[in-house]
Amino acid sequence: MSRLFRGATIVWVVLRYGLDELVLTSFQKPWLRLLARIVSFGRKLDAPRGQRLREALERLGPIFVKFGQVLSTRRDLLPPDIANELALLQDRVPPFDPDVAVATIERAFRRPVGEVFVSFERVPVASASIAQVHFAIVRDRHGVEREVAVKVLRPGMLPVIDNDLGLMRAMAGWVESLSADGKRLKPRQVVAEFDNYLHDELDLIREAANAAQLRRNMERLGLVRIPEILWDFCHPEVLVMERMKGVPISQIERLRAAGVDIRQLARDGVTIFFTQVFRDGFFHADMHPGNIQVSLEPGSFGRYISLDFGIVGSLTEFDKEYLAQNFTAFFRRDYKRVAELHVESGWVPADTRINELESAIRAVCEPYFDRPLKEISLGMVLMRLFQTSRRFHVEIQPQLVLLQKTLLNIEGLGRQLDPELDLWSTAKPFLEKWMLDQMGPQRLWREVKAESPHFAKMLPELPRLLHDYLHHKPHDHRREMQELLAEQRRTNRLLQSIIYGGMGFVLGLLALQFLIRIRFFH
């Protein structure tokens, strides 16, 4: 009954904001297009379609807002006006009752909140659709009191999410089966990705592991602070981490007044991102201004502070090679190489005409070179390449789409800090170093080091293995030769039987004919 009521609510919102005309007018069947005209008759929709879609998602609640945020990253699928509007969605919901947060903590740790924390601030400092954050003080295993941030999962979310996802899957299947444009947008695939994303966010242990991995990777870089996870106080519904104190990166004038080098800050952000991408293959994929602060503390003045690790991206060596060579070929205007990279990736259908793909890529990329390098957006280049590839039915991998969205965020943030930021000059050393590492002796040395434990295990066994091989191989060879000779003898005997039998048959016929003739003449 609740799903039926929720479905009716969704239909009402769709009609109220005129979203039906976005879908029904693209249907192939004439009667459906006629239905669209009848439904929209006499209705005045003054707002643009992107704005109406955004307002409808906000009306449907936090799960649909989340869906819109995730959908806004798929610029390879969406028209620009819709993607830009969806990017404005804010995940802001009222905080839930502090008593509920306390009950969640006590249920997770099976003891009163006063025994878990030295002190706990009941008023949350931040609230979103999935969780909210409280400040607290905890005594660690060494007896030291530490200021921490406590992230508590919003209770009762799983049934709500599963209910809305079920309706989304039904709508996606309906749109994909009836509309050619809908099928091209792959709604069922998008909903499936959103399903995985939401269920990942519901497990705070996974987020804690992401934070710990990024902290370990970034420790020696010295440009970013990532909170330490207090694993003794973590649970799938509760995440406790070091409290970070900084100024939101959007408050540029406050940072400048404090003496922070804003231009260097812009370059540091790009350096952090490309280090995560090309060195580690593991990057923070939700680096919008709300998740980034800047430290003003003496020991870490001017460093980035990174927060919220629910969304991360992972890249294989193949993904990194694809990116590095694409960027390099783009700046060399080697569009044939860009097309070849798509072919080598294995994502291009077998019947694709490479010369047509190259021509389409040239049409996308060439206009960028009328601008100074500092005005070229690598994120936009990737996005346009993905859009062009989609026309040729190239399947772009989700991790690369996630990286493209993150790169756009980094570029936007960097140019907000420093409008003169030349992203290519900052990225080029990373690409060159990565390609040198892949083709030079360093890669060979890394592979030797990686395999050395295996070699060390096998080394003591080599003399015995060699002895066994030399001892058994002659016997094996002799046995094989004996079997071959025996088979040859059997074959020879068979051939002899056939030949002798045939000769006997022929001689018998000749003898019979000779006898018949003798009788005939006598």
Swiss-Prot record:
<keyword id="KW-1133">Transmembrane helix</keyword>
<dbReference type="Pfam" id="PF03109">
    <property type="entry name" value="ABC1"/>
</dbReference>
<dbReference type="GO" id="GO:0005524">
    <property type="term" value="F:ATP binding"/>
</dbReference>
<comment type="similarity">
    <text>Belongs to the ABC1 family. UbiB subfamily.</text>
</comment>
<dbReference type="InterPro" id="IPR004147">
    <property type="entry name" value="ABC1_dom"/>
</dbReference>
<dbReference type="InterPro" id="IPR010232">
    <property type="entry name" value="UbiB"/>
</dbReference>
<dbReference type="GO" id="GO:0004672">
    <property type="term" value="F:protein kinase activity"/>
</dbReference>
<feature type="active site" description="Proton acceptor">
    <location>
        <position position="286"/>
    </location>
</feature>
<keyword id="KW-0812">Transmembrane</keyword>
<feature type="binding site">
    <location>
        <position position="151"/>
    </location>
    <ligand>
        <name>ATP</name>
    </ligand>
</feature>
<dbReference type="InterPro" id="IPR050154">
    <property type="entry name" value="UbiB_kinase"/>
</dbReference>
<dbReference type="GO" id="GO:0005886">
    <property type="term" value="C:plasma membrane"/>
</dbReference>
<keyword id="KW-0831">Ubiquinone biosynthesis</keyword>
<comment type="pathway">
    <text>Cofactor biosynthesis; ubiquinone biosynthesis [regulation].</text>
</comment>
<keyword id="KW-0808">Transferase</keyword>
<dbReference type="InterPro" id="IPR045308">
    <property type="entry name" value="UbiB_bact"/>
</dbReference>
<keyword id="KW-0997">Cell inner membrane</keyword>
<keyword id="KW-0067">ATP-binding</keyword>
<keyword id="KW-1003">Cell membrane</keyword>
<keyword id="KW-0547">Nucleotide-binding</keyword>
<dbReference type="GO" id="GO:0010795">
    <property type="term" value="P:regulation of ubiquinone biosynthetic process"/>
</dbReference>
<feature type="transmembrane region" description="Helical">
    <location>
        <begin position="496"/>
        <end position="516"/>
    </location>
</feature>
<protein>
    <recommendedName>
        <fullName>Probable protein kinase UbiB</fullName>
        <ecNumber>2.7.-.-</ecNumber>
    </recommendedName>
</protein>
<dbReference type="GO" id="GO:0006744">
    <property type="term" value="P:ubiquinone biosynthetic process"/>
</dbReference>
<dbReference type="InterPro" id="IPR011009">
    <property type="entry name" value="Kinase-like_dom_sf"/>
</dbReference>
<feature type="binding site">
    <location>
        <begin position="125"/>
        <end position="133"/>
    </location>
    <ligand>
        <name>ATP</name>
    </ligand>
</feature>
<feature type="domain" description="Protein kinase">
    <location>
        <begin position="119"/>
        <end position="497"/>
    </location>
</feature>
<comment type="function">
    <text>Is probably a protein kinase regulator of UbiI activity which is involved in aerobic coenzyme Q (ubiquinone) biosynthesis.</text>
</comment>
<keyword id="KW-0418">Kinase</keyword>
<keyword id="KW-0472">Membrane</keyword>
